[in-house]
């Protein structure tokens, strides 16, 4: 089983992933916990490039998208597909839906570009995607409490509003796969809501 976790900054994805990871392990199941961008040594190097705040050069939106997919291709081949072939459960902090929400809805890139990349480099989609949804202001306040903000977290409120709208578009288009979780609830309540979809 392949499960991805999506949402804007500070909505509690990491906390939920840890809880679900523990839940499956207590059932004696083998679980792989991973993230995007990242998940392999090479993909983590790309992640560092993507998140770094570079005052000397602005990263173009196309470059950002291509770097994310370079990391994703490596991640799929090295981690996700081998784990699924071994009948392990894969829990991924973000996957292709993040690219639609952030790069297409947020940045305004063409969906055709994303579709082309998905067709050529993404051979497996999650069976279940949890979208943790909360007001942008709430999530950003939580993100600020964590400390220094990365390149994405420093974006304006209007950007994250578009990202959230992108996630909502996906959720309405694919309600069977994408499950919206109310991230204004406590971590335990979010976990209980998620478990209902995994029963």
UniProtKB/Swiss-Prot annotation:
GO BP annotations, alphabetical order: dTDP biosynthetic process; dTTP biosynthetic process; dUDP biosynthetic process
Sequence positions that bind ATP: 7-14
Origin superkingdom: Bacteria
Transcription regulation as UniProt keyword: no
Family annotation (CDD domains): TMPK
UniProt xrefs under Gene3D superfamilies: P-loop containing nucleotide triphosphate hydrolases
Keyword ATP-binding in record: yes
Keyword annotations: ATP-binding, Kinase, Nucleotide biosynthesis, Nucleotide-binding, Transferase
GO CC list: cytosol
Disulfide feature: none
InterPro entries linked to this entry: P-loop_NTPase, Thymidylate_kin-like_dom, Thymidylate_kinase
Pfam families referenced in this protein's UniProt entry, alphabetically: Thymidylate_kin
An annotated Gene Ontology molecular function: ATP binding
Enzyme class: transferase
Catalytic activity: dTMP + ATP = dTDP + ADP
EC number: 2.7.4.9
Cited PANTHER family: THYMIDYLATE KINASE, UMP-CMP KINASE 2, MITOCHONDRIAL
Function in brief: Phosphorylation of dTMP to form dTDP in both de novo and salvage pathways of dTTP synthesis.
Family: Belongs to the thymidylate kinase family.
Protein name: Thymidylate kinase
Organism: Acinetobacter baumannii (strain SDF)
Lineage: Bacteria, Pseudomonadati, Pseudomonadota, Gammaproteobacteria, Moraxellales
Gene symbol of the encoding locus: tmk
